[in-house]
Amino acid sequence: MMNLDMIMSTNLITISRKDNLARARELMHDNSIHHLPVCVDKELVGLVTLTNALAATDSILRDPDSRMHAKAILVEDMMVTDIATVDENASLRQAALFLEKHRIGCLPVVTDGELHGIVTDTDFVAVAINLLEQIEDTEPLEDAQPDEI
């Protein structure tokens, strides 16, 4: 059985809840990520998603009287705190089914209360591509003649 520890990202970019929207957007942009764990030490306390960041940005733009800008909105005011997590020993199948069922883009991997990694829908696409390539390598080509294989 393949476990999450085989595909999860462990070189994590995290943010503090006292950081601001501008910093969150900068980290997401510079690191090409859509999910930003919010940690106190190694404990996961929240999650900022690209969707959260865009919604917060949109709310600033819609209110012309607002004096708030990206530096004034704190991460703790826009982060999601009700976060589904998974243990690194969970199977890939279990995690993939959970992501699909709940229509979420990532699962932080938490063991003994500490954030150890994150697995995203992109990680599962990479697994699917790998499996498809393996199938293609083992199956004969449909259009090929027997002597061409």
Please give the residue ranges for each predicted region.
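Charged, low-complexity, helix/coiled-coil-prone segments
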Residues: 34-45, 64-72
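Tandem CBS (Bateman) regulatory domains
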Residues: 1-11, 49-84, 91-100, 120-149
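Glycine-/small-residue-rich active-site loops that bind phosphorylated ligands and cofactors
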Residues: 13, 20, 45, 84, ...
